[in-house]
Amino acid sequence: MDIAPEDKGENVRREICLTLEQMGIRPECSHHEQGPGQNEIDFRYAEPVKAADDAVTFRTVVNTVALRNGLAADFSPKPLRSEPGNGMHINLSARSSTGKDIMPQVIAGILSHIADMTAFLNTTPASYQRFGSYKAPRYISWSSENRSQLIRIPAAEGEYRRAELRSPDPICNPYIAYTLLIYAGLDGIRRRAELPASADINFYTASEEVRSQYKTLPATLADAKAAAKTSEFIASSLPRTVVEYYTK
């Protein structure tokens, strides 16, 4: 991983962050990522619609600043087959007006519907080449232990207590993605869904015997589309025309 002064993207990231701040989006951290020319910028949480607006604005700013510096930004999920892919980790929090801890039910709801949602979170064949390596999840699981999980629970409390969904990639439509996550979480609350036991293992090093105990995300885009087409949850959450467009 490049570090200053060898990190050639440092000045570009700084320019992106300053531009975002001028547009009312608050960057929280930026750094070189694991792959060559790969960079990460995290920005502050917001209510769902604002968060989706921020995600779209972010992509526009990155593309514009990159072009201004003679570069091209690539948000595709797997730009280089033998290198880490690009993810769009979604951090989400939910609070009850009564003070009850509803996060376990929200996470359980998302886990129960994630396979049906995947066609909308990972929309290209290359999306599925990313799963299962370089910190990208393959198994439907949660834990606070490591980054091989589908849902990671960061060590944070108070307003920063959250769940991090690690499967989506940056070319998904954030409005659709957030809609599905909200409906899945609400379904978990409505059903009082029970959160399965945490998977406190590293799936990248675990034995096949251990990994076989867990369900996986769809292996291909065709598998993901097939799951979405027959899903009552998807049919009840999105307009029919949207479902048909993403599953054709």
Pin down the residues of each PLM region.
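Glycine-rich, acidic/polar active-site loops that bind/position phosphate-bearing ligands
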Residues: 1-248
